[in-house]
Amino acid sequence: MLEHYGLMLALGCAVLAIVYGMLSARWVVAQPSGNARMQEIAAAIQEGARAYLNRQYLTISIAGVVLFVLVGLFLSWYTAIGFAIGAVLSGLAGYIGMNVSVRANVRTAQAARHGISKAMDVAFRGGAITGMLVVGLGLLGVAGYFAILQAMGLPLEQNLHALVGLAFGSSLISIFARLGGGIFTKGADVGADLVGKVEAGIPEDDPRNPAVIADNVGDNVGDCAGMAADLFETYAVTVIATMLLGSLTLAETGPHAVLYPLVLGGVSIVASIIGAAFVKVKPGGSIMGALYKGVIVSGVLAAIAYLPITQALMRENAHGAMSLYACALIGLVLTGLIVWITEYYTGTQYGPVQHVAAASTTGHGTNIIAGLGISMKSTALPVIAVCAAIWGAFHFGGLYGIAIAATAMLSMAGMIVALDAYGPITDNAGGIAEMAELPPEVRNVTDPLDAVGNTTKAVTKGYAIGSAALAALVLFADYTHNLQAANPNEVFAFDLSDHTVIIGLLIGGLIPYLFGAMAMEAVGRAAGAVVEEVRRQFRDIPGIMTGTAKPQYDRAVDMLTRSAIREMIVPSLLPVVVPVIVGLLLGPRALGGLLIGTIVTGLFVAISMTTGGGAWDNAKKYIEDGHFGGKGSEAHKAAITGDTVGDPYKDTAGPAINPLIKIINIVALLLVPLL
């Protein structure tokens, strides 16, 4: 009976999140969208974003159909159906979220005419839609498919293997969306900056720049649709991995270990919806403070709600209900720590960013050296925090305790994605205000909103990486337990004296570097093509710089769309193909080594790239705020170079490593019956 009510609670909360998202979308779209010029610019951004996503999803669907058939033939059709559900829901969360985002941008710009409170309301509500859809659709997919399989009378083991298929489907969408969106957005950004700011000397978001619309489109497909797919996948994967681990250790964890993570996710949705209502800013008030207030309220309410649920469901757990409650609290505390650490390394008010800005005064080279130093140093505190969380959670609840800490951390995804999706909305709002030549007081509202948006985007990347590392660790635990269950007569230990384990470790360690290199080179090629196109238009359409002729915005958008789709395919298949080859050729121990190697180097490479890139970006903004000579100074030119390097670091290669480390683990989990 308790099981039935718990499942209904999870499904009810998932539906509540989707209803909240739909009502908020209706409210946002009902807001005024400004004058004809603003609407024209917004329509161009909407058209570009839609064209890109349609082509991206068409390409993914071709790969998806092939994988659907392979999974069905070699594993089971229930797993294949799960794969399809995960892929469709992940794509849907990103698609709807992005469609709202490209409508909220112009409405935020219009609301900025009436002050910061109104503009903040529109921008945050626009972001909250994506956040609630991610957790709502994620929980609905996992709990709904689980409920259907249970109703069909399938054994628990078969149910959970089918859910691993759902995790694989969401992961596939995630890596394509993260990588393709990242190549598009940074190809546009770097190309627009190199010719616009550096060569032509025109400011950011200047309507004379032929790549300016592509740049604004990129903000949405990268930071909104890309992040939505990334955290949808991490959310779904973590819940499924925790359910699977609970089922494999039922004797220790008690009869409700499979249901517990679903209920935690459900009550956290209610906490996030209440927390979102607290995000209000008064004129002269702190924007970041208002956003953090929402996160803190959500976290505190979730912590309160976890207690009765844990006591009701986990009384029969060998570690005790209060020990598991402590594990859930560790997950929430880790969320706060990761957010604070990332802000420290990427916020303009702190030492690391100011150090990079100061280094810019002595030239381009010293800016790069300082940025690389910060990017490497920034790995220390987050990794120590993750290690402390793993130690604490294991102490209280064993491997299942680590899984619960990861689930609690991911249960805040609704609120965290809202912070992230707020970023491209305010960024676009500033761009629209600039291109539509709105009065300076509008930019005085959109600029501080955008500055905070840059920090929230960096913070959510840190959160996504930390949670991905924990999720991958839980998946690895599932892999080892599944191996043991499938081969009860053999003892599986990943011994460093075993040469196949060492080979696996080394191959796993190189994959994030190889993948990151492919992503960086792809952005370089895409940006180079944009630079050539922008130069051609400046040369062949002489009236652009004087404002008498209009640039061909659609050329850059179309070129980047084709380039991003082409470039994303090979790197995205890397984490699917490599574990299959290693597992089938070298065996399960080498595959285990591969998983650990990828988790370790993936965590460091991802943190280093995203935080370092964020520090370069905000060092440029710090100088633009009037420090070290301000805009147009030699320090500013050096900072633009650093930002140009940092852009693909933080928005393409770094974030795409998150889904990479999880896909490798999921593929390994699916391979267990074949090993």
UniProtKB/Swiss-Prot annotation:
EC number: 7.1.3.1
Site positions for Determinant of potassium independence: K457
Residues involved in Mg(2+) 2 binding: N216, D219, D427
Binding site for substrate: K186, K650
Catalyzed chemical reaction(s): diphosphate + H2O + H(+)(in) = 2 phosphate + 2 H(+)(out)
One GO MF term attached to the UniProt entry: diphosphate hydrolysis-driven proton transmembrane transporter activity
Protein name: K(+)-insensitive pyrophosphate-energized proton pump
Matching InterPro entries: PPase-energised_H-pump
Gene giving rise to this polypeptide: hppA
Subcellular location: Cell inner membrane
Pfam families assigned: H_PPase
Binding site for Ca(2+): D617, D643, D647
UniProtKB keywords: Calcium, Cell inner membrane, Cell membrane, Hydrogen ion transport, Ion transport, Magnesium, Membrane, Metal-binding, Translocase, Transmembrane, Transmembrane helix, Transport
GO CC, alphabetical: plasma membrane
Family the entry assigns: Belongs to the H(+)-translocating pyrophosphatase (TC 3.A.10) family. K(+)-insensitive subfamily.
Summary of subunit composition and partner proteins: Homodimer.
Residues annotated as binding Mg(2+) 1: D189, D193
Cofactor: Mg(2+)
PANTHER family from the UniProt entry: K(+)-INSENSITIVE PYROPHOSPHATE-ENERGIZED PROTON PUMP (PTHR31998)
Membrane topology: Multi-pass membrane protein
Record site feature (Important for ion transport), residues: R178, D223, D230, D651, K662
Membrane-traversing stretches: 5-25, 65-85, 129-149, 164-184, 231-251, 258-278, 287-307, 321-341, 384-404, 405-425, 458-478, 500-520, 568-588, 590-610
Function: Proton pump that utilizes the energy of pyrophosphate hydrolysis as the driving force for proton movement across the membrane. Generates a proton motive force.
